[in-house]
Swiss-Prot record:
A cellular-component GO term for this protein: plasma membrane
Highest taxon above the source species: Eukaryota
Organism: Pyrenochaetopsis sp
Protein purpose: MFS-type transporter; part of the gene cluster that mediates the biosynthesis of the trans-fused decalin-containing tetramic acid phomasetin.
Membrane-spanning parts: 55-75, 83-103, 113-133, 144-164, 175-195, 203-223, 278-298, 317-337, 357-377, 384-404, 421-441, 449-469
Subcellular location: Cell membrane
Its membrane topology: Multi-pass membrane protein
Protein name, as recorded: MFS-type transporter phm3
A molecular function GO annotation: transmembrane transporter activity
Length: 485
């Protein structure tokens, strides 16, 4: 145990009030303390990141895996409202809007591990409920709760990576973490199409349930708490019992606030970031529009590949693989370049987090280019591979925008603020992902695929300056609009 005892540093003098504030502070036992998560072995750290990535994979897989089977559920439950029919898919994403704000706050107060386990248990229970639902109200309620629970790993995963890695080591870890959120929506329709075709819509939930149960059990066996304030508080509590010294406290503890005040501050922090920080607001809105545009793009696939190119239900799912290939290419670039760009400046000072945005600066035009490519090639009825290549370009750009943005927020707000910053990002992203696709049918009915996707491309172009501005002025904005962590 590391204790700061001023009597050893100021012999024959009485401690001043300032000295007393640092008496009996419990900290790590030096820089190499094996109990510090940042000193865990590479194997242990990687295992934790893979578990979190697995959590996000099944939670995002479930978002769209059911979509091919939605018409069958609509028929089974005799749903006549088009809005309710759309909600059978999108209400899951709405759970991602509300869940993050509470879960991020709790994780920054009580730790990460127990939240992962509770969210996994809730998710498993209500996925069973979805599979066994007998009416519309039951299904929608269970599906919404599943979405709220599934948002947990999405929200606090970035905080876990901040706990485990120094800033210059986070690139590859974030690339692993990003596999689930970005590949899940691509793989989901492929698997869902085959399952629905050969079994029924209920089996899309049973399949996700089996996968989620396996990953949840692995996480329960492998994972440990990573949040430094919780670990140091436990250490301080053990030392208070061992020594009988009630004055011992953790270095990270806030002795000036009550538990209720700390909880209130933690709950307010994400909303404060959204309202006060231009960085969080601008990046979250950019990511939200991009996420929403991608989900809106998905709404065109049945018409483009099913009607125009005469794909079967199974083949329609394969059309999503263009996005998947693009995202895999983006993952490779991000993993290779992200940490290299965060080079150590001269003089030994810490690299500024804005260096994370370099990839975002160069890749931001790719998404508009991809939408132009996809829209006009589909309208011209070129060979089916041409619009799929356009979606691959969108996939590369999407990954190289979303991941640098999230990693920048992690670096900028640190281990105690990362989850709150990502809660805002995830919440807005999910809101736009649920709402923007509703604009698809009227947009394409009036403008067709060419000009309809051109409108989306122009929206993407409007956001291209955002990473340029934040790269240049982000450090100034962080200092001018600080967030109390």
């Amino acid at each position: 145990m590391s204790l700061q005892d001023p009597t050893k540093e100021h012999n024959n003098t009485s401690p001043s009030p300032k000295d007393e504030k640092t008496d009996y502070v419990v900290d790590w036992d030096g820089a190499e303390d094996a109990a510090n998560p940042r000193n865990w072995t590479t194997r242990t750290k990687t295992a934790h990141v893979l578990c979190v990535s697995g959590f996000t994979l099944y939670s995002n897989l479930a978002a769209v895996m059911f979509a091919p089977g939605a018409p069958l559920l609509v028929a089974d439950f005799h749903i006549t409202s088009t809005i309710v029919a759309s909600l059978t898919v999108s209400i899951y994403i709405l759970g991602f809007v509300f869940g993050p704000f509470l879960l991020a706050s709790l994780s920054e107060l009580y730790g990460r591990l127990w939240l992962y386990h509770i969210c996994n248990l809730i998710y498993l229970a209500f996925t069973v409920g979805c599979a066994l639902s007998t009416n519309t109200a039951m299904f929608l309620a269970f599906r919404f709760i599943c979405g709220c629970a599934a948002s947990g790993p999405m929200t606090i995963g970035g905080g876990t990576i901040a706990d485990l890695y120094e800033a210059e080591e986070r690139g590859k870890a974030m690339a692993l973490f990003g596999l689930g959120p970005l590949l899940g929506p691509v793989i989901g329709p492929v698997v869902g199409g085959f399952v629905t075709e050969h079994l029924n819509w209920r089996w899309t939930f049973y399949l996700v349930l089996i996968l989620a149960a396996i990953i949840a059990i692995a996480g329960a066996v492998i994972m440990r708490e990573t949040f430094e304030p919780v670990l140091l508080e436990r250490k301080a509590a053990d030392e208070r019992v061992r020594t009988g010294n009630r004055q011992l406290r953790a270095r990270t503890s806030d002795g000036t606030r009550t538990a209720n005040q700390l909880l209130l501050r933690a709950i307010i922090r994400p909303l404060k970031m959204l309202c006060v920080s231009p960085i969080v607001l601008s990046l979250s809105v950019y990511c939200a529009f991009l996420f929403g545009l991608t989900y809106l793009l998905f709404t065109t696939f049945p018409a483009v590949f099913g009607l125009t190119y005469q794909f079967s239900t199974e083949q329609e799912g394969l059309a999503f693989l263009g996005l998947g290939v693009g995202m895999i290419f983006g993952i490779a670039l991000f993993a290779i370049l992200s940490d290299k760009l965060l080079h150590q400046p001269r003089g030994g000072t810490l690299a500024r987090p804005e260096l994370r945005l370099v990839l975002m600066v160069w890749s931001s035009p790719l998404v508009p280019i991809g939408f132009f490519w996809y829209g006009w090639s589909a309208q011209s009825t070129t060979h089916w591979i041409v619009p799929i290549i356009g979606t691959a370009v969108i996939g590369i750009g999407a990954f190289l925008i979303l991941m640098p943005a999230q990693l920048y927020l992690v670096d900028a707000f640190g281990t105690e603020g990362a989850a709150s910053a990502l809660a805002v990002n995830t919440g807005l992203r999910s809101l736009f992902g649920a709402v923007l696709p509703l604009a698809g049918p009227p947009l394409y009915s009036k403008l067709d695929l060419g000009w309809g996707n051109s409108v989306l491309a122009f929206i993407g172009l409007a956001f291209v300056p955002v990473p340029f501005v934040l790269y240049k002025y982000g450090e100034t904005l962080r200092k001018r609009f600080p967030i109390d962590r």
